[in-house]
C-alpha cells in the first residue's frame, strides 16, 4: 500500500470564477483569495454591473486597494454582457488589457442578473467579434424559462443555447462555468480546445441530498443548484480523468448571514477560505492527486493563453478547522464547511 503524502507542492493556483462583491464585503472576503491564489476572474454582477471599461478599471482599483500587504494578487476583470452593449466598448476593453473575458448571464438566472441578456441570438455580433479577437466567453449555463424545472435548466441550456452558439462560432473560446450535471461533464469531454469548464468544490463534495435531507442547509444553496448523486459522481470522474478542459473556479459568492438564513435566502456559497484544502481532499478521495496541480494551476492558464505562475504553494496534511462564522461589520458571513475539519491545510 502506498504511503499517504504528507505534503503537496503545486504551482500557485488561480481562481477562474469568483465573486468579490464590493465595499465592506470586498475587504472582508478578498484576503482569503489573495493569500492563496495569484489571479482570479472577477465576476461583473455587482448591483450596478460592470459594462464599461471605466467601471472595470474603477472596480479593479477598489480590489487592489483591498489586497493586504504581502499578498501578490492580480484581479482579472470581466465585462457583463447586456442586450445593448456596444461592441466597441467590449473590443477596446479587451485590447487595452482591462477585460480578460466577457460574461453571459441569461436574464434573471442568478444573483444580480436582471441586466442580463434576454435575447441571446440578438448579441451574436458580440460573439462574432469575440471570436475574431480571441476573447473568451464565460457562460452561466442555465435556461430561465419558468416552465423548466430548476434541476433541468443546465441540461436544457446545452441543447437550446450552447450548442447553437458553438455551431455558429466554432472558434469562440467558451467556459461553461460551474458545471453541475453529467450532461455538462460529458458535453465538455466530447468538445474541443475551444470549450472548457470550471467546477466548484461544493458540487464535487455534495449533492442535493446533503442540502435537503434532515433539514434545509441554506449555506449549500447556490446556482446552479446541487443536483442528484449521479451528477456529482460524473463531475468527480471528470476532474479525476486528467482532462485539461476542466479547471478550478470556486464561484465563491458571499452573502451576509441574515441574507442566507431567511424565508427567501440568497444563492451563493462562500468557499474561498477552504477552497484549496477542499479540492485537495476531493482529489485524494478519488486517488487523483497527480492531477490536482493541473486542475488548480495549469489548465486554466493554458485555456486563457496566460503564463502559469512561477511560485508555489504547499499543502500539508494538518487538520484545518473552518471557523463557524467570519465577522462582517456588525454581521457575519458563514463560510463553506463551517465548523468542519479538513485533512489538508495551506502552509503559511
UniProtKB/Swiss-Prot annotation:
Pfam families in alphabetical order: Amidohydro_1
Highest taxon of the lineage: Bacteria
GO cellular component terms given for this protein: cytosol
Annotated GO MF terms: dihydroorotase activity; zinc ion binding
EC top class named in words: hydrolase
Modified residues (N6-carboxylysine): 103
Keyword Metal-binding recorded: yes
Keyword annotations: Hydrolase, Metal-binding, Pyrimidine biosynthesis, Zinc
Positions that bind Zn(2+) 2: 103, 140, 178
Location of the active site: 251
EC number: 3.5.2.3
Pathway note: Pyrimidine metabolism; UMP biosynthesis via de novo pathway; (S)-dihydroorotate from bicarbonate: step 3/3
Requisite cofactors: Zn(2+)
Alphabetized NCBIfam families for the sequence: pyrC_dimer
Function per UniProt: Catalyzes the reversible cyclization of carbamoyl aspartate to dihydroorotate.
Subunit structure: Homodimer.
Family according to the record: Belongs to the metallo-dependent hydrolases superfamily. DHOase family. Class II DHOase subfamily.
This protein's name: Dihydroorotase
Source organism of this protein record: Yersinia pseudotuberculosis serotype IB (strain PB1/+)
Gene: pyrC
Amino acid at each position: 500500500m502506498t504511503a499517504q503524502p504528507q505534503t503537496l507542492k503545486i504551482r500557485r493556483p488561480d481562481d477562474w470564477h469568483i465573486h468579490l462583491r464590493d465595499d465592506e464585503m470586498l475587504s472582508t472576503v478578498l484576503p482569503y483569495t489573495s493569500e492563496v491564489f495569484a489571479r482570479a476572474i472577477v465576476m461583473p454582477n455587482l448591483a450596478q454591473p460592470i459594462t464599461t471599461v471605466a467601471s472595470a478599471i474603477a472596480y479593479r482599483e477598489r480590489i487592489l486597494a483591498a489586497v493586504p500587504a504581502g499578498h501578490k494578487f492580480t484581479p482579472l476583470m470581466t465585462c457583463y454582457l447586456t442586450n445593448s452593449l456596444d461592441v466597441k466598448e467590449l473590443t477596446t476593453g479587451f485590447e487595452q488589457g482591462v477585460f480578460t473575458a466577457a460574461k453571459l448571464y441569461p436574464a434573471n438566472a442568478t444573483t444580480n442578473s436582471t441586466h442580463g441578456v434576454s435575447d441571446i441570438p440578438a448579441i451574436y455580433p458580440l460573439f462574432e467579434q469575440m471570436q475574431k479577437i480571441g476573447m473568451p466567453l464565460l457562460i452561466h449555463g442555465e435556461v430561465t424559462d419558468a416552465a423548466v424545472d430548476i434541476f433541468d435548466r443546465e441540461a436544457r441550456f446545452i441543447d437550446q443555447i450552447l450548442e447553437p452558439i458553438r455551431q455558429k462560432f466554432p472558434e469562440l473560446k467558451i467556459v461553461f462555468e460551474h458545471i453541475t450535471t453529467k450532461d455538462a461533464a460529458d458535453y465538455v469531454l466530447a468538445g474541443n480546445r475551444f470549450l472548457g469548464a470550471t467546477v466548484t468544490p461544493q458540487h464535487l463534495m455534495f449533492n442535493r441530498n446533503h442540502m435537503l435531507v434532515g433539514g434545509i442547509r441554506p449555506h449549500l444553496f447556490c446556482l446552479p443548484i446541487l443536483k442528484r448523486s449521479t451528477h456529482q459522481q460524473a463531475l468527480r470522474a471528470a476532474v479525476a480523468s486528467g482532462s485539461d478542459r476542466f479547471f478550478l473556479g470556486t464561484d465563491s459568492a458571499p452573502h451576509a448571514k441574515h441574507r442566507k438564513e431567511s424565508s427567501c435566502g440568497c444563492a451563493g456559497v462562500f468557499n474561498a477560505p477552504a477552497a484549496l484544502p477542499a479540492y485537495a481532499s476531493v482529489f485524494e478521495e478519488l486517488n487523483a492527486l497527480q492531477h490536482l496541480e493541473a486542475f488548480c494551476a495549469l489548465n486554466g492558464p493554458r485555456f486563457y493563453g496566460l503564463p502559469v505562475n512561477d511560485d508555489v504553494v504547499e499543502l500539508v496534511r494538518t487538520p484545518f478547522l473552518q471557523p463557524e462564522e467570519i465577522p462582517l461589520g456588525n454581521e457575519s458571513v458563514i463560510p463553506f464547511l463551517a465548523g468542519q475539519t479538513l485533512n489538508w491545510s495551506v502552509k503559511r
